């Protein structure tokens, strides 16, 4: 069996392992680009949380569509690089093309990789849709399709245009 034939199995196991709909997102404390602390409790909700990496080809393909949704809906998209080599400078440079995304960066308390581990993320990109109570409504391992993401935002209580 080739390594590519195992990919669906890995994705299924990853989805089974990750936070599930109905579960509260874990506590974290990361910094926004201005140095303000963002926690699970303080983030604006409903929201979308995307775990990504600068080298990830699926992330590169997906981000323009996600950014359009962020622009159209006004829903906050928090993006967290789970890649240890993605420094603050790399993340902020990458995010210049996506001004509606709010990148979250390492703080004195947490590193993005630690937060990804609490969400039980096993790859890139992983997208979580969170409702006003901070509970996961939907998660996507890999690309999040536009219609599915908009449906999840409606389930999260988002007031879409």
Describe the function of each predicted region.
Residues 14-40, 102-103:
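N-terminal "domain-start" segment that seeds a small globular fold
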Residues 95-133:
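Short, internal strand/loop/helix patches
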Residues 7-14:
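Bacterial N-terminal signal peptides
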Residues 39-57:
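Short active-site neighborhood of thiol/selenol oxidoreductases, capturing the structured segment around
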Residues 60-98, 108-115:
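Structural microenvironment flanking redox-active thiols in thiol-disulfide oxidoreductases
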Residues 25-26, 46-47, 124-126:
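Short loop/turn microsegments at loop-to-beta-strand junctions
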Residues 1-7:
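Bacterial N-terminal signal peptides that target proteins for export
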Residues 126-161:
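Thiol-/selenol-based redox modules, centered on thioredoxin-like
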